[in-house]
Every structure is written in structure tokens, then in C-alpha cells.
Swiss-Prot record:
Entry protein name: Transmembrane emp24 domain-containing protein p24delta5
Example GO BP: protein transport
Species for this entry: Arabidopsis thaliana (Mouse-ear cress)
Subunit-structure text: Probably oligomerizes with other members of the EMP24/GP25L family. Associates with the COPI vesicle coat (coatomer). Associates with the COPII vesicle coat (coatomer). Interacts with p24beta2.
Domain notes: The cytoplasmic C-terminal domain contains a functional dilysine-retrieval motif, which is involved in the retrograde Golgi-to-ER transport of the protein.
Positions of modified residues (Omega-N-methylated arginine): 169, 174
Membrane topology: Single-pass type I membrane protein
GO cellular component terms, semicolon-separated: cis-Golgi network; COPII-coated ER to Golgi transport vesicle; endoplasmic reticulum; endoplasmic reticulum membrane
Keywords: Coiled coil, Endoplasmic reticulum, ER-Golgi transport, Glycoprotein, Membrane, Methylation, Protein transport, Signal, Transmembrane, Transmembrane helix, Transport
Residues annotated as glycosylated: 86
Subcellular location as annotated: Endoplasmic reticulum membrane
Function: Involved in vesicular protein trafficking. Mainly functions in the early secretory pathway. Thought to act as cargo receptor at the lumenal side for incorporation of secretory cargo molecules into transport vesicles and to be involved in vesicle coat formation at the cytoplasmic side. Interacts with p24beta2 at endoplasmic reticulum export sites for endoplasmic reticulum exit and coupled transport to the Golgi apparatus. Once in the Golgi, interacts very efficiently with the COPI machinery for retrograde transport back to the endoplasmic reticulum.
Signal sequence annotation: 1-27
PROSITE patterns: GOLD (PS50866)
Length: 216
């Protein structure tokens, strides 16, 4: 009975981990055109998050002579995090320094003359999915259900951090929206005041003009 409970518990944790890790690791397939086209992928990531990615060219039309691509990864502020040229496969890894949109772009060098577009696979992992759990298990001598519980704990912490990040972003956006609305309201009041002053001055001018001409 105890063994069955452990087995069922292990299966439950495995299923939970599978669904929770979907958003933290994903494989992306890009079709890059041959005529100087660039394909980019982006991800909104908070600060202090580990990001790992492998990319590789898949050419079904010419598997023996795989074409090369160039790649560049930039931070939200435009800092260069990774740059390689003319490779068939590569990898980049970094820890985010600031929250925001991280951009990875891939393109074919114009000197290559290809008849067909190429397919590029990008295995993008971040946060808890990028952690080397085999090394953790060997270092701390844990396995089975205990290891899965440790992974589940890490996932819960990561999800909580993401929720806090979303909450903070929402508060920032709300503050910006309130500030903008306040400025628009003051601008409307000032515009109305200017219109009243202009209309009043026009009325006074016309009144003086008519008095001068003895029309009234």
C-alpha cells in the first residue's frame, strides 16, 4: 500500500510538473526566407531570471550541406547579449539584469544563395526550466519524489515571483494611466479657460468698437 501511494504521488507530481513547466520551456520553429529576411522571437522576462536557448538549422532539401545563419540577442535597453555569424547551430545563456522584452533575431547572410527558405529550431528555456536538476540531485543526494517536490517548490516560487511582477507592472500602468488622465483633465481645463478668455476679449473689443462707431 505504501509503495502504491508513493507511485501515485510520484505520478501526480509528474503531471503537475508537466503542466507547470509548459510556460517555462518551449520549442519554436521559424522559417527564415532566403532573400535577406530576418525572423525574431521575443519574451517578456522579469529581472534575475536565467535564460538558456539552443538553436539549430534544419534543412530537409539539403541535409548534407546545411546552410548557416547569424543570430543576435538584445536586452530591453538594446544591450548586446549574444551575437554569432554563419553557424548551423548555437547556444546562448544569460541572467536578465532588467525586466522587459528580450529579443532574439536570426537571419541568413546575403552572400548565401539558397533556393528554398530554411527552418530554424529554437529551444528556449528560462527560470526553473533552465535549472540543471540532475546536478542538484547529485549534489544534494536526492531523488524520486523528493526531487520532484524540490522542483515543484521551485516552480511555485517562480510562479509567485511572476505574479508579483505582473502585479507591480499593473500598478505601474495604473499609475501612468492616472497621471495621464490627470494631465489630460488639467489640459482640458486650461484649454477651456483660454477659450473663455479669448471669447471675453473679443466681446470687449466688439463692444468698444460699436461704442466708438456709435452703433450702440
Amino acid at each position: 500500500m505504501a509503495i502504491n501511494r508513493i507511485a501515485h504521488g510520484s505520478l501526480f507530481l509528474t503531471v503537475v510538473l508537466f503542466f507547470l513547466t509548459v510556460n517555462y520551456g518551449e520549442a519554436i520553429w521559424l522559417t527564415i526566407p532566403t532573400t535577406g529576411g530576418t525572423k525574431c522571437v521575443s519574451e517578456e522576462i522579469q529581472s534575475n531570471v536565467v535564460v538558456l536557448a539552443d538553436y539549430y538549422v534544419v534543412d530537409e532539401h539539403n541535409p548534407e550541406n546545411t546552410p548557416a545563419v547569424s543570430s543576435k540577442v538584445t536586452s530591453p535597453y538594446g544591450n548586446n547579449l549574444h551575437h554569432q555569424e554563419n553557424v548551423t547551430h548555437g547556444q546562448f545563456a544569460f541572467t536578465t539584469q532588467e525586466a522587459g522584452n528580450y529579443l532574439a533575431c536570426f537571419w541568413i547572410d546575403s552572400s548565401h544563395h539558397l533556393a528554398n527558405p530554411i527552418t530554424l529550431g529554437v529551444d528556449w528555456k528560462m527560470g526553473i526550466a533552465a535549472k540543471d536538476w540532475d546536478s542538484v540531485a547529485k549534489k544534494e543526494k536526492i531523488e524520486g519524489v523528493e526531487l520532484q517536490l524540490r522542483r515543484l517548490e521551485g516552480l511555485v516560487l517562480s510562479i509567485r515571483e511572476n505574479l508579483n511582477y505582473i502585479k507591480d507592472r499593473e500598478a505601474e500602468m495604473r499609475e501612468v494611466s492616472e497621471t495621464t488622465n490627470s494631465r489630460v483633465a488639467w489640459f482640458s481645463i486650461m484649454s477651456l479657460g483660454v477659450c473663455v478668455v479669448v471669447v471675453g476679449s473679443q466681446i470687449l473689443y466688439l463692444k468698444r468698437y460699436f461704442h466708438k462707431k456709435k452703433l450702440i
